[in-house]
Amino acid sequence: MSKEQKTFYLTTPIYYPSDKLHIGHAYTTVAGDAMARYKRLRGYNVMYLTGTDEHGQKIEQKAEAKGLTPKQFVDEIVSGIQDLWKKLDISYDDFIRTTEERHIKVVQQIFEQLLDQGDIYLGDYEGWYSIPDETFYTETQLVDKEYDADGNLIGGKSPDSGHPVEKVREQSYFFRMSKYADRLLQFYEENPQFIQPESRKNEMINNFIKPGLEDLAVSRTSFTWGVPVPRDPKHVVYVWIDALSNYITALGYGSDQQEKYENYWPADVHLVGKEIVRFHTIYWPIMLMALDLPLPKKVFGHGWLLMKDGKMSKSKGNVVDPVPLIDRYGLDALRYYLLREVPFGSDGVFTPEAFVERVNYDLANDLGNLLNRTVAMIEKYFDGKIPSYVKDGTPFDADLVELVYSTVKKVEDAMEEMEFSIALTAIGQLISRTNKYIDETQPWVLAKDESKREQLGAAMYHLAESIRYVSVLLQPFMTKAPQKIWEQLGIDSSLTTWESLETFGQIPGNTNVQKGQPLFPRLDVEEEVAHIKSLMGGSKKPEEAPKDEKEESDEITIDDFSKVELRIAEVIDAEPVKKADRLLKIQLDLGYEKRQVVSGIAKYYSPSDLIGKKVICVTNLKPVKLRGELSQGMILAGSEGDQLRLATVDGALPNGSLVK
């Protein structure tokens, strides 16, 4: 590595191999992979680390139940995890296992150092413990508490996962967390970008640090599957020191070969789920302070990928296995959905309907159809050879090129903030604009007039070159489709670099195109939604709720009103419904998905009047068909006499925002 080359060190959490991983784990790792691929495209020397946290009581118990040693148990699951990452095209640079000697040896060194300098001491622990979470909780942190007849607390649940806790008492080594609380707060103030999104920082300060940090139990004696404490082998090093230190042990810290550590540490970003932000922004920084090591530059706590009935969880059995989705719909479809559907810092809901819509609307209709039409027209009008570049050959070229350049900037800005959905939205807007360019230039009309031959050539070139830009911008997110696009456009690797985006007009004239298979075949919505639901175990119908026999009232309660889900939506397309003078078919962007609504407003608005308006949509209405068109909601409007106006929203609230 040259000294001038910038480095970028990115990590996922190390996953707990108590069972197969699900699509929620894939979400984190695919996001990290997109970031790693982007940084490599920008010329960085990237270290992308993932791995497995393999010790603990839960694994010890599961292995015993299966008649296996803990190591045999985790070896089998870890092999499956590595197979999954291969199937997802995860381009990790190292995979750390906490059962590896390179890790165990350094964990013991760290524990001994902290013990010798007085940051760890021996004491007794009594408190509440969740085995699945491998986490201790104070009485005040528990939820759903249970009391006996005398008012004594006898149980409760983890505030992070809802798992039950049990009372434990055992001897333990403790880490003096409280000693570093003020220093940690000062670090937060001096490094405002350390915890992202911002809301996570406020949660850490108000919920954990200001109430007073308690010293942390860092060893256990109630199980043996862990790293032994060197001077007291009846204790095993607990997860906080064992698991968190993987970020430096994987780099060779504490070993004879520290070159990677010196090159890459401190980490540029730790990617974690929001439920473990506390461990990475309080426990880990304090541990590093005690070791007198630099702190990571950023911890990004992303949201959860939820099911309609709540958090996806192995213990609940409501998980989605990504493998059947990849096998049926292709890797790129799944990677695109995961990164486009949900803003990375927010929670999102996985639904079969949204998945199929993303594939059909964004990938098959918009991207796939654009490539197919472009290649077909170049074959038809120019014998399969891309014409030479002519600047401003049509009146629409300048606007398209301007959007091409601005899209590159939008993607770069979004990626620096890990705003994957915003980056993909910008690319999607360029795809839509390029499709519109076909309608504006009307190549089929130009082809009929020999005097318009140069304009026709300019249109074909601008289409091909714009698609090239799209393909390069998609590389961090999709690992298969860009290569297929390059093959159809006949472009070589020199035109697939990020540097090639600096100047429009790079494809040489006379480049041969070659039509290929559709990038993304269009899916049968009803059939594929049903198939995905069957994979999710969703074929069972919920029992009908008992009907309320009370007489209806003109008044409603706040509970009644709260059942109505109102969200801000942007109109992205509209057209009349055939043989229905009053109806318009309207396409809405809700941020997390696109929907179609049929509305009786044709008398008051033309389709072009609606494009770009921010409207309020009722999003939890049961879908219905009106004149054969599916309507998935209702947009709000006010009326008096023969006047009607849509309820619109001012300001910059994002699509999908709840109206309260």
Swiss-Prot record:
InterPro entries: aa-tRNA-synth_I_CS, Anticodon_Met, M/V/L/I-tRNA-synth_anticd-bd, Met-tRNA-synth_bsu_C, Met-tRNA_synth, Met-tRNA_synth_2, Methionyl/Leucyl_tRNA_Synth, MetRS_core. Keywords: Aminoacyl-tRNA synthetase, ATP-binding, Cytoplasm, Ligase, Nucleotide-binding, Protein biosynthesis, RNA-binding, tRNA-binding. The keyword ATP-binding applies. This is Methionine--tRNA ligase. It catalyses: tRNA(Met) + L-methionine + ATP = L-methionyl-tRNA(Met) + AMP + diphosphate. GO terms for cellular component: cytoplasm. It comes from Halalkalibacterium halodurans (strain ATCC BAA-125 / DSM 18197 / FERM 7344 / JCM 9153 / C-125) (Bacillus halodurans). One of its GO terms (biological process) is methionyl-tRNA aminoacylation. The gene is metG. ATP binds at K314. It is found in: Cytoplasm.
